[in-house]
Amino acid sequence: MRVTDFSFDLPDELIARYPMAQRNASRLLTLDGNTGTLADKQFTDLLGMINPGDLMVFNNTRVIPARLFGQKASGGKLEILVERMLDDKRILAHVRSSKSPKVDSIIHLDGGYEMKMAARHDALFELELLSDLTILEVLEAVGHMPLPPYIDRPDEDADKERYQTVYNQNPGAVAAPTAGLHFDDAMLDALKAKGVNIAFVTLHVGAGTFQPVRVDNVLEHKMHSEWANVPQDVVDLIAQTKAAGKRVVAVGTTSVRSLESAARASEGELKAFSGDTDIFIYPGYQFQIVDAMITNFHLPESTLIMLVSAFAGFDHVMAAYQHAITQKYRFFSYGDAMFVTKKAH
């Protein structure tokens, strides 16, 4: 398959640059992966689509304020975007400046903090904090929320809350698991009251999620690596759910990738998993665990639209996106959502 097969023209006004006033006020496009049938709904209608005994799996990563501003010793300005935290003092990061900082040079951050350029790893820089504080403490003090490039505005105070799920727990993501942004506490309580089971995995979404695919042939793409954790209690819940003939519903592509990574690591039989994953899901992939998913509308030619196409069928997904454009759904991180059931292979 060609990467350009996943292209579509999106009017600029359909890119959501701000979230809705209420989390669950978004629209919801449902797609039946077997038939291609579409239905226009509200996100709150999801309550009627998830059945008692179904298991919903959420990604509980917490977005860190991963964008830092500062200057080199020479006075040149730079911008740092954390890719991942290596430990309490060291990060791997993208650095934007007129000239790359040299090894052992000092970077002066806003707020008076300093970092040393320790090493370079291809396009990423290893930076070391020169402070008694931890990286996380400095990020919380002077970091900015790492809004995606297409939102095309400076971050605001409201983004600290809204570019974050209500159930976030484990700091480490530099992009939000956006399907989860639609859920508020009341909706989670309503799902539980209905008898829906809730479980949490962790995948620290990296900045690589916004990198364009730079090859023509889908098969030649090398996926970026992210850290994921699927604990034993989730594995047990999935086994019980499958045994009872109920569905595993993944909230977001990151939850899908976490569960399928765990299944891949143990060759199909799901076992607990913790470590880096570079799983790349595109049409032809056989899903082992997930039966239905909730996801936002993704960028053209992105690995995320490829994943959804693998799940529900390429033709069905591309037709759904054209429908969404015609019906003026809101796209990308702060936009509307889809509820998609898996196409039988």
From Swiss-Prot:
Pathway(s) annotated for this protein in UniProt: tRNA modification; tRNA-queuosine biosynthesis
Annotated keywords: Cytoplasm, Queuosine biosynthesis, S-adenosyl-L-methionine, Transferase
EC number: 2.4.99.17
Gene3D superfamilies assigned: QueA-like
Name of a matching Pfam family: Queuosine_synth
Catalytic activity: 7-aminomethyl-7-carbaguanosine(34) in tRNA + S-adenosyl-L-methionine = epoxyqueuosine(34) in tRNA + adenine + L-methionine + 2 H(+)
One GO term of the biological process aspect: tRNA wobble guanine modification
Disulfide bonds: none
GO molecular function: S-adenosylmethionine:tRNA ribosyltransferase-isomerase activity
This protein's GO CC annotations: cytoplasm
Subcellular location: Cytoplasm
Subunit structure: Monomer.
Protein family per UniProt: Belongs to the QueA family.
Function: Transfers and isomerizes the ribose moiety from AdoMet to the 7-aminomethyl group of 7-deazaguanine (preQ1-tRNA) to give epoxyqueuosine (oQ-tRNA).
Protein name from the UniProt record: S-adenosylmethionine:tRNA ribosyltransferase-isomerase
Annotated source species: Shewanella sp. (strain MR-4)
